Amino acid sequence: MQRKGILIILDGLGDRPIKELGGLTPLEYANTPNMDKLAKIGILGQQDPIKPGQPAGSDTAHLSIFGYDPYKTYRGRGFFEALGVGLDLDEDDLAFRVNFATLKDGIVVDRRAGRISTEEAHELAKAIQEEVDVGVDFIFKGATGHRAVLVLKGMADGYRVGDNDPHVEGKPPHKFSWEDEESKKVAEILEEFVKKAHEVLERHPINEKRRREGKPVANYLLIRGAGTYPNIPMKFTEQWKVKAAAVIAVALVKGVARAIGFDVYTPEGATGEYNTNEMAKAKKVVELLKDYDFVFLHFKPTDAAGHDNKPKLKAELIERADKMIGYIIDNIDLESTVIAITGDHSTPCEVKNHSGDPVPLLIAGGGVRTDHTERFGEREAMKGGLGRIRGHDIVPIMMDLMNRSEKFGA
């Protein structure tokens, strides 16, 4: 019997012991009866998205977890961001990830502009698209929250351009670096683009309103992750001969899923932010599993809480995710399904960024050899029967349990 599969990524799930939580991690601190139930009837382990000690970006981590070698396939974040906001790009386009940020006296004081809403970001992006002219064709489009996408048409040869993002607050933006004449041209265009966009943003009514309300203004653009068309050798759906769907709100992860052949769905209320409607996602997964062989579910807010150094909020979000998972397992046949739960990487609250810590992994459902673990958490995962594996081992293990793998050899 061929089983169906559900892969759930709780973004930035892994963490470190936190004094505020009594020496527990947010996952260990959280009340997670549904994931604990799966742990008791499943098998735990740890996974390194790239390799031990290597912090992973969300893009490279997801590529790896879906079974691709990011060192061979990855050509920058920007292209995935662009695919994720629904742009169909040409192979000679150059795409970038952009943050709306707050600049004061030449210093970046907030890299996410107070986590402005998606609606605000889209209005600001529209104004930039309409009012900025840098002498080349470009597309500037809001994504999720403080995120946006910039595409320079026909300029892929300039991909060796650097970022202006200092990646920490309290420092001035970087100048765009370059390595050759093509990337020098792109760097000059980006400098002009950022300057003109800054002028548009400073006077925009949304920022005037935010000033009056005492909120951080979104008056600057931090641009990074120059990306060209990814080198995907074979679609996920072709490699595993499955019909695959994804339930995602965040543009970057949507882009990765689109690039490898998933049909992508975003139910109403799914925002990728703290206010996301996780139950709408759960219901969509159950609905899609009737027509698809493999369903991927992405939950973003846990990562944001790690970046914001909010341990108790991260634990609360994990509890919300657990209820989402509870709805799913209550409405599917676990014997005919394989379910895997992990994070794309660790985002420890103390680091406020991605780290190279391994990520706890849980697999349960039909055909799974159980171990003696009792609940889902970092330390319990260290005892699990899966041991410590690589991120790109997860899908092959799932497909084998789903009875969809082909034998190697005679």
From Swiss-Prot:
One of its GO terms (molecular function) is metal ion binding. It comes from the Archaea. Keywords: Glycolysis, Isomerase. GO terms for biological process: glycolytic process. The keyword Cell division does not apply. Pfam families: Metalloenzyme, PhosphMutase. Pathway: Carbohydrate degradation; glycolysis; pyruvate from D-glyceraldehyde 3-phosphate: step 3/5. It catalyses: (2R)-2-phosphoglycerate = (2R)-3-phosphoglycerate. Its EC number is 5.4.2.12. The keyword Isomerase applies. Catalyzes the interconversion of 2-phosphoglycerate and 3-phosphoglycerate. HAMAP family: ApgM_A. Belongs to the BPG-independent phosphoglycerate mutase family. A-PGAM subfamily. This is 2,3-bisphosphoglycerate-independent phosphoglycerate mutase. It comes from Pyrococcus abyssi (strain GE5 / Orsay).
